[in-house]
């Protein structure tokens, strides 16, 4: 007869399993983005985690051109506005519990963080 399966043991094994984690950082402010990515890399180095990055993805430039005058009278002058969106990708290979500790840092306002876990 087989021994009953211990649920705690199964949960611990699943938690210690190494996952591929991708952290995507997006912001319009480069300095804040670099600070957050440096903090994540620094924390990953403390736990001796296999890491790749931060990989700098191409900057998206959103442009809008509008007429200066609201009624169409006068000379045809235009205003051009643009917003630059910067993106960084960091790949980690670690257990999920360790990644929770790494990502519990203070994230500066204006920086969006997306964490995806692959088995």
From Swiss-Prot:
GO MF annotation list: RNA binding; structural constituent of ribosome
Keyword Signal attached: no
Top-level taxon in the UniProt lineage: Eukaryota
GO biological process, one term: translation
One GO term describing the cellular component: cytosolic small ribosomal subunit
Alphabetized SMART domains for the sequence: Ribosomal_S10
Localization per Swiss-Prot or TrEMBL: Cytoplasm
Keywords from the named record: Cytoplasm, Ribonucleoprotein, Ribosomal protein
Annotated InterPro entries: Ribosomal_uS10, Ribosomal_uS10_CS, Ribosomal_uS10_dom, Ribosomal_uS10_dom_sf, Ribosomal_uS10_euk/arc
PROSITE patterns for this protein: RIBOSOMAL_S10 (PS00361)
Pfam families: Ribosomal_S10
Coiled-coil positions: none
Family: Belongs to the universal ribosomal protein uS10 family.
Annotated function: Component of the ribosome, a large ribonucleoprotein complex responsible for the synthesis of proteins in the cell. The small ribosomal subunit (SSU) binds messenger RNAs (mRNAs) and translates the encoded message by selecting cognate aminoacyl-transfer RNA (tRNA) molecules. The large subunit (LSU) contains the ribosomal catalytic site termed the peptidyl transferase center (PTC), which catalyzes the formation of peptide bonds, thereby polymerizing the amino acids delivered by tRNAs into a polypeptide chain.
Subunit and partners: Component of the small ribosomal subunit. Mature ribosomes consist of a small (40S) and a large (60S) subunit. The 40S subunit contains about 32 different proteins and 1 molecule of RNA (18S). The 60S subunit contains 45 different proteins and 3 molecules of RNA (25S, 5.8S and 5S).
Cited HAMAP family: Ribosomal_uS10 (MF_00508)
Protein name (database record): Small ribosomal subunit protein uS10
Organism this protein belongs to: Candida albicans (strain SC5314 / ATCC MYA-2876) (Yeast)
Name of the gene this protein is made from: RPS20
